[in-house]
Amino acid sequence: MHRNLAATVLCCLAAFAPKAPASDAPTLDNRWAHITTALFCTSQDVDKLLTKPEDRAAALAYFAPLKLSKFYLENGSGDPAAVPVLRDVAAALRAQGYEVSGAVVPSNRGPLCYNDPKDMALLESKVKVLAQVFDEIIVDDWLFTTCTCATCVEERGSQSWADYRSRLVAEQSKIHLIDAARQVRPGVKVIIKYPTWYEGHRQNGYDVARQTPQFDGVSVGIETRQPTTQDQHIPTYSGYVLQKWIGGNAGAKWRSAWLDNYQMEGADDDFVAEVGQAVLARAPEIIFWCAGVLHPPRASASNYPHLAAMMPEFDRLAGLLEGPSRGIPMHLPIGSVGEYNIFGYLGMIGLPIDPRESVPEDTKAAIFTKHSLADPKIADEILARMRGGKEVFLTWPLLQALRQSELGRVLNVISEGGTVSSPIFRTHEGLWETKPIDAGRPFTFPRIELSTWPYARDVGLVREDADFGILMRTSYLGGQVDVLNLPDNTYDLERLPAEVLDAIRLCFFDELGVRLTGPGGVALYPFGSRQYVLYNMNEASEKVSLRFPKTAPVRGWRETMVGRDLPATPVDGGQGPWARHEIDVALTLKPFEIAVVEAP
């Protein structure tokens, strides 16, 4: 699954250029077997692409490769004159076998002020128009507010902006959005869409714990875009975690994943990787935003041929997935914030993440980050896991925040502060064995200097004056404590030498029964007891392996996306208590290739 497939459909898509076929061709039987797709149409898209029959026919032909099941039609004003137009377009689409719902972008001029009667009147008028036509309305993620007008500041009083705005938006949107729509159509369903920028949700008025019960359904964003250059810098794997975390919290109310290609010209593979996260998270529906940006003459339409080429592969992938998704339990209370998108970065180094709202109690290992500080009892709960003989994996920033508890005594830190840079790492291979690793360029980390004993540095960063802690592991209170120091540039996690990443992944071998070996930028998604999906999100081909316990079979391994047998080789780990005897299943992944590895 990579770029060259797009070339195979370029000529075909030329046939779908905006020209008018004689009539709309019925498409009721033209659906994906394993995924459901939908298209958001702004009010401008409705006017330009769907209002006139000849334009609509051309648009439906152009978007035919997406095999859409549904359209979301935006109403951009409160003018009642929009009602007959929306009714006509919706009726024409339904006649072609499509589902059709309404859509509202709450404001026309940036974030709303919920203390401004004009803004509230505009919101009401928009949804009242939509409720005359549709049984369901989805709300674009401009429901938030950043207003700091005199009224908002005065009304906030001594509250934090997060507490004030999350209450204000919930209360006012109930009155001026949900109730306003139901005044027109009592049974209308209103769906809230949560943006990808989870770290600012409550600060700007989104409150998942409060709003998911309030609304009839939930759509969760996967606007990861181009991770290294787009201004939000969201790792692609975050899109998967957000679906499992926020969508999973919604239960039966989880309706869809929502993705876009904003500022992604020339980043075709990153765009379709958003689709991949939705498919692997098993999103009930995938919404593409929006028709206008995927359609000529917009420059962003350059992403569309590759998207169209990849959709059959994603449908096939969805059909291959068997059993429940598995991952490393990670404590992520709803509404929490911590190290920015740390769950996405961990996923991008091959650690599959299973977000948990409460502290995991039934697992061998679990990950804790600063997000866990949303739980006021977190130190005691982590210590209880340790006393129960469990393994806890902590980020260094979390351990710093909890140093007044017993956790502050886990490591013997003799000096810290500032940063340290070096190209040389050292991994601990056994009681007296270590291995130096030259990364080829310097990496910068917060400086953590430990005493020689107890020897806790499984991975150190080597400078002339000391080995500094990167991955620290020690026993304490009958349990195992792992502490990960995060690089100054978080994206450098993906660039760490494979040997360093392998040491980090080894912490979770007993929990997962499998570990990835190889470079970063390759994500692992286990399903059931015998299926392992690998997604190489690098621009280069990568050699990777899946390592299993020595009792795993050595014959019968298959990769089912391409259809090939895979070799399995016993790995002799030597002698002694640190020896590891494993079964190695190796394969090479092309750029942005997805592989589905199945055990016998």
Model-inferred region functions:
Residues K370-P600:
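A conserved amphipathic helix/loop scaffold
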Residues S23-I378, A384-R387, W396-Q404, G469-L477, ...:
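Glycan-processing catalytic domains of CAZymes
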Residues L13-A14, C149-E154, T427, E433, ...:
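Residue-level detector of bioactive/disordered segments in secreted/extracellular proteins
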Residues A6-A17:
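Bacterial N-terminal signal peptides
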Residues K19-P21:
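Sec/Tat signal peptide C-region and signal peptidase I cleavage site
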